[in-house]
Structures are given as C-alpha cells and as structure tokens.
Design a protein with these regions (language model features):
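Positively charged n-region of N-terminal signal peptides that target proteins for export
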Residues: 1-10
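C-terminal motif of bacterial Sec signal peptides marking the signal peptidase cleavage site
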Residues: 21-24
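Bacterial signal peptide processing site
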Residues: 26-28
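Extracytoplasmic "Venus flytrap"
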Residues: 31-40, 44-64, 68-69, 81-91, ...
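Periplasmic-binding protein-like
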Residues: 47-48, 100-111, 128-132
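An alpha-beta-alpha
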Residues: 65, 156-176
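Short, well-structured alpha-helical segments in soluble
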Residues: 88-103
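Flexible loop/hinge segments that line or gate small-molecule binding clefts
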Residues: 122-149
Length: 176
C-alpha cells in the first residue's frame, strides 16, 4: 500500500513539474517592451568600454560615438563614457549607474559584457541596450536589447587571399 501511495505522489509531482515547465518555457514570445520614441533633446547615451582610448579597439568605439553625437547635433552632456570596465559584475553596476544618470541608450563594446548588459536590460525595460559583438539578442527576445555585429566573413576572405598571395611570393609556387 505504501508503495502505491508513494508511486502516486511521485507521478503527481512529476506531472505537476512537467506542466509548470511547459507553461514556463514559453520562449517563442518576445518580451513585450513598449519603447517610445525619444526626443532629440532627451537622448542621453552611455558608452561602456573594456579599455580606454589607448586600446585601438576601444578607441574606435569612442571616436565613432563622439562623431555620431556630433553628426546628430547632440550636446556633449548627452554622452557619458565609462572606460576600463571589466567583464565582471562591475559592468552591470556601470550600466545601472548610467541608467540612474538618465541614460536611455546604452552601448557596450566587449563580448564579455553581454550577460551583464542583458541583466541590466531585463531590469530596465525603458532603456535601449546595444551590445557590440553580442550573439544573444535574437534568442533572448528582449524588446530593448540589441546586438551589433558586423558581417566579418568578407574580411576573413580577404585575409585568406592575402595569406595565399604571401605564400606564393615566399615559396614561388601557386600550384601547391
């Protein structure tokens, strides 16, 4: 009798867990976020960089952001740059700090920042978060989290062609 009761309880627990799991795994739906247009004078951008401008990678983002702000006719005080932000919890803290300073658009430039930026995006649905080199925006389906990643296959192809030409130059045999 005890075995039957135990088996019944376990079956009920399993079915309950299965139903809860199926209901909770509604991953095909995008999280509904109502992002309203931002008036030009209300735009405030935060930029989170792994290193400072001494790193050519980060300098590229810093210079591009400065140029974008200028081209859009935004004021200098509409951009806050945070450099030297490691791929740790400090990235999340920095993103939240930027939100608290009024930033409504936040960019991060390091692959390792992604999980921290996603967490901030989840907690701050009214702020737009952009992550360079990220890969999870299309799978996580946050309405306010976006990835920016170039199609780099062209560059890889050209690098391969250049390497092949160098081999021919060095060894003189294009036929292998």
């Amino acid at each position: 009798m005890k075995k039957k009761v135990l088996a019944l309880v376990l079956c009920l627990a399993l079915v309950t867990a299965l139903v809860i799991g199926l209901v909770a795994c509604n991953g095909d739906e995008k999280r509904v976020v109502d992002l309203k247009p931002i008036a030009k004078e209300d735009i405030k951008i935060g930029l989170i960089c792994l290193h400072d401008e001494q790193s050519t990678y980060d300098k590229n983002f810093i210079d591009a952001m400065d140029e974008a702000v200028k081209d859009l006719g935004l004021r200098e005080d509409q951009l806050i740059k945070k450099t030297g932000i490691p791929e740790t919890e400090k990235c999340y803290d920095t993103a939240i700090d930027l939100v608290e300073q009024g930033c409504n658009i936040i960019f991060a430039d390091s692959f390792g920042h992604e999980d921290y930026i996603m967490r901030a995006a989840y907690e701050c649905p009214d702020v737009r978060f952009f992550h360079a080199t990220g890969t999870k925006a299309h799978t996580e389906k946050y309405g306010n989290y976006f990835n920016a990643f170039a199609s780099i296959y062209e560059g890889r192809y050209l690098a391969g062609v250049a390497a092949g030409l160098k081999l021919v130059e060095t060894y003189g045999d294009s036929e292998g």
